[in-house]
């Protein structure tokens, strides 16, 4: 299953990142940043009209490379001008060709909330999302047990990040 492959690759990638910058150092940097307790994603999604979270992604396992020339910043700004409520930025590098700089630069250049869309399996990724400027993170029930989901949700909230929780069926919701 593709999800299992992605998670396996993320574990390898995160282990390499931890060799470059330790979890303790990343945590210290993230906790030193201002904690936005306004939770802008929730506020952005309370408009009476339809709310859109528009996605910025270079590639996907099903479609391959979507845009060889990938003007991610232009795309994000156009979404904002078109009335998007928030922007979702793929940061997963192996299957979606995401990069941290996409999230960081978009967050610095738009005024709407920015969601870090990754396959979050380690608290390291949550601290990193905060440092990169995310307003929110994606938590996927299919790859997290209940205890880890709650732990990550609490950590994100402590850092001032909103959580968008993805569930695929009734059992994952329970």
Show the residue positions of the predicted features:
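Alpha/beta enzyme core
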Residues: 66-90, 109, 123-136, 149-154, ...
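Short, cationic motifs built from Arg/Lys/His that form the positively charged side of catalytic pockets
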Residues: 55-57, 107, 116, 125, ...
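Glycine-rich, proline-tolerant flexible connector loops at the mouths of alpha/beta enzymes
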Residues: 24-33, 60-66, 85-106
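An N-cap/entry alpha-helix motif that binds or orients negatively charged groups
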Residues: 2-67
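Alpha-helix-loop-beta-strand connector modules within alpha/beta enzyme cores
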Residues: 36-53, 97-119, 141, 150-168
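Short, small-residue-enriched loops and turns at beta-alpha junctions
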Residues: 60-64, 93-97, 122, 143-146, ...
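Conserved residues at the C-terminal ends of beta-strands
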Residues: 9, 90, 140
